[in-house]
Each structure stands twice: as C-alpha cells, then as structure tokens.
Swiss-Prot record:
Residues found modified as N6-(retinylidene)lysine: 296
Annotated protein name in UniProt: Rhodopsin
Feature type site, description Plays an important role in the conformation switch to the active conformation: 113
Chain sites annotated for binding Zn(2+): 201, 279
Residues annotated as transmembrane: 37-61, 74-96, 111-133, 153-173, 203-224, 253-274, 287-308
UniProt membrane topology term: Multi-pass membrane protein
Modified residues (Phosphoserine): 334, 338, 343
Stretches in topological domain Extracellular: 1-36, 97-110, 174-202, 275-286
Post-translational modification as stated in the protein's UniProt record: Phosphorylated on some or all of the serine and threonine residues present in the C-terminal region. Contains one covalently linked retinal chromophore. Upon light absorption, the covalently bound 11-cis-retinal is converted to all-trans-retinal. After hydrolysis of the Schiff base and release of the covalently bound all-trans-retinal, active rhodopsin is regenerated by binding of a fresh molecule of 11-cis-retinal.
Effect ascribed to mutating residue 90 to D: Increased thermal stability and decreased retinal uptake. Decreases stability of the inactive conformation
N-acetylmethionine sites (modified residues): 1
Subunit structure: Homodimer. May form a complex composed of RHO, GRK1 and RCVRN in a Ca(2+)-dependent manner; RCVRN prevents the interaction between GRK1 and RHO. Interacts with GRK1. Interacts (phosphorylated form) with SAG. Interacts with GNAT1. Interacts with GNAT3. SAG and G-proteins compete for a common binding site. Interacts with PRCD; the interaction promotes PRCD stability. Forms a complex with ASAP1 and ARF4. Forms a complex with ASAP1, RAB11A, Rabin8/RAB3IP, ARF4 and RAB11FIP3; the complex regulates Golgi-to-cilia rhodopsin/RHO transport in photoreceptors.
GO function terms (MF aspect): 11-cis retinal binding; arrestin family protein binding; G protein-coupled photoreceptor activity; G-protein alpha-subunit binding; guanyl-nucleotide exchange factor activity; identical protein binding; opsin binding; zinc ion binding
C-alpha cells in the first residue's frame, strides 16, 4: 500500500521511513511545504470573506423586500442557507486547521466538518434538481395547468434537506466514516479504504448512484425537455414575447447554476471515484486537495449568479445597500425572472 491507514485516518504517504503521524496529533509538513498549508488557509479566508457577506445579503434583502418572497425564490434562498452552513461549519474549521498544518479538532471535529461540507454540497445539488423539475413542470406543462406555489416550494425545500441528510448523516452513525483528506486539513467521505467495519464500499456506491448520478440524470432530462418545448412554443408563438423572454431568463439562470455546479464538483467527484476504484495506489496529497478545495467555491458562485442575472433582486439589493434609494434608477416593479412561476408556456 502506498499510504498509511490508522484507526480513523488514511494518509496518502507510505510510512516506510517512519515519518507519518496521525493528522489529529501532529503537523503534516512531510506531505507538503508549510507555505502550501498557508496558501490553503489564505484561500479559505478569501472564501469566508466572500461567502458570508454575499449569502447573508441574499437572505437579508429577501426579508426586507416582500416582492422577492416568491415560490421559486424559496429554493434559491435554500441555497444561501446551505452555503452559510458550509461557511460556518466547514470553512472556518478548515482555515484554522490549515494554519496549524493538521486537523487539530480531532475525530469529532472531523465528523462535524465533513458533515457540513457534504450537507451543503448535497443541498445545492438537490436544490438544482427541484429547480429543474420546477422549470420542467412550469414550462413543459406535463400536468396541464399546474402552478408552482408556496406549498410546493416548501415541500421542495424539505425534500432537499431530507435527501442531503440521507447522504451526510450515515457516516456519523456507522455507515462509512469521515476522515481527513488530501493534505489532512479538511474532512470528507472515506474513499480511500474498504474499512469493512463501517461497510464503507457499499456507502460510497450508494452515494455516487443515489446522490450524484440520479440527480444529474433528472436535471439533464428536465432541461432537455424544456429546451425542446421552449423552441416549439416560440416557433408557434403560443406566448407573448414578454412571457417567453421571462421564461428564457429564469431558465438561463438555472442552467448556468447547473453548469457552475458541474465545474466545481465534477473534478472532486471524478478524483474521488478514481481513488475509490484504485485504493492503495500511489497518489499524492495534492491530488485530492485541489479538487476538494475548488469544490468549496460553490458557496460563493450561486448568489453571484442570482444577483447578476435577476434584475429585480439586483435592484432590491442596491436599494437596501443605499438606505432605501436606488441610484441606478431601475424600476423594481418590472417583469423579472423571479416572478415567472405562473408561466403559461405550453408544449406543442
């Protein structure tokens, strides 16, 4: 084996020379230079400085402006809440551990950090599934004149949390486990060892199939149907130009969120799957560290996309920041993507 396995860790470094120490007890500077750990800490500090204000602002602006409290926005706000969980439960912990060069909070802290990171990522993925289904139901009308209302949005939010917990909670109760990964300063699911005591392999397969592949299949199916329906409706001019424009805007926004999610999480998922299928092979700590830390940017990009592509929310945000005045002079009451859940676009 090209790594060293302990009772609650796996270090991707052979202990033939006797230098390997538990990532819960001693700095891991034999894995990487101290300055590299400092770079990780600086990166986490940047994500905290960006992730907390922009997600908190998303929640605050919505509370301040009643017009933003639409069913579709409930799902988008759910993403902001999940991102804040990642910032407080994961990023702050990883910042501190990176400064020390090892996971100073012990196995319990590792469980909490891994749980919050997994929970946030899964809430984001299942929120995108709910958004994709909402777009499919609203635009393609498979259920006649069904309207996506507040109760449906609340059920959608509850669904995302149930599914996310179904992925993040089992390692806390004995099905798989959370262990330090990469440079041993952040924690994630154990892809590295079979660890028969916790039936680790069965959980990893379950997670990849149920909590990654199936959601992506649903998302791609919904948007494939949606693109076809919108083109057909536009060709037959079934809707007004204003309605079609609004539907295209909200659909474009959600599709960009999906693309951003894939850019952030596919490298991590790909590396994790490779490690899982090549357990014991030779790979360095950087191999998992880079995609793991890159995936954490997901806590920043969703609100940025939302703010950039939603004119009404952007205007409300500017009004809030400028103490009730909007220097841009845009009309907040204009038709926007956040109010398109009552769309009447129908299939051909």
């Amino acid at each position: 084996m090209n790594g060293t396995e302990g009772p609650n860790f796996y270090v991707p470094f052979s202990n033939k020379t006797g230098v390997v120490r538990s990532p819960f007890e001693a700095p891991q500077y034999y894995l990487a230079e101290p300055w590299q750990f400092s770079m990780l800490a600086a990166y986490m500090f940047l994500l905290i400085m960006l992730g907390f204000p922009i997600n908190f602002l998303t929640l605050y602006v919505t509370v301040q402006h009643k017009k933003l409290r639409t069913p579709l926005n409930y799902i988008l706000l759910n993403l902001a809440v999940a991102d804040l969980f990642m910032v407080f439960g994961g990023f702050t912990t990883t910042l501190y551990t990176s400064l020390h060069g090892y996971f100073v909070f012990g196995p319990t802290g590792c469980n909490l950090e891994g749980f919050f990171a997994t929970l946030g990522g899964e809430i984001a993925l299942w929120s995108l599934v709910v958004l994709a289904i909402e777009r499919y139901v609203v635009v393609c009308k498979p259920m006649s004149n069904f309207r996506f209302g507040e109760n449906h949005a609340i059920m959608g939010v509850a669904f995302t949390w149930v599914m996310a917990l179904a992925c993040a909670a089992p390692p806390l109760v004995g099905w798989s486990r959370y262990i330090p990964e990469g440079m041993q300063c952040s924690c994630g699911i154990d892809y590295y060892t079979p660890h028969e005591e916790t039936n680790n392999e069965s959980f990893v397969i379950y997670m990849f199939v149920v909590h990654f592949i199936i959601p992506l299949i649903v998302i791609f199916f919904c948007y494939g149907q949606l693109v076809f329906t919108v083109k057909e409706a536009a060709a037959q001019q079934q809707e007004s130009a204003t309605t079609q424009k609004a539907e295209k805007e909200v659909t474009r926004m959600v599709i960009i969120m999906v693309i951003a999610f894939l850019i952030c999480w596919l490298p991590y998922a790909g590396v994790a799957f490779y490690i899982f299928t090549h357990q014991g092979s030779d790979f360095g700590p950087i191999f998992m560290t880079i995609p793991a830390f890159f995936a954490k940017t997901s806590a920043v990009y969703n609100p940025v996309i939302y703010i950039m592509m939603n004119k009404q929310f952007r205007n409300c945000m500017v009004t809030t920041l400028c103490c009730g005045k909007n220097p841009l002079g845009d009309d907040e009451a204009s038709t926007t993507v956040s109010k398109t859940e009552t769309s009447q676009v129908a299939p051909a």
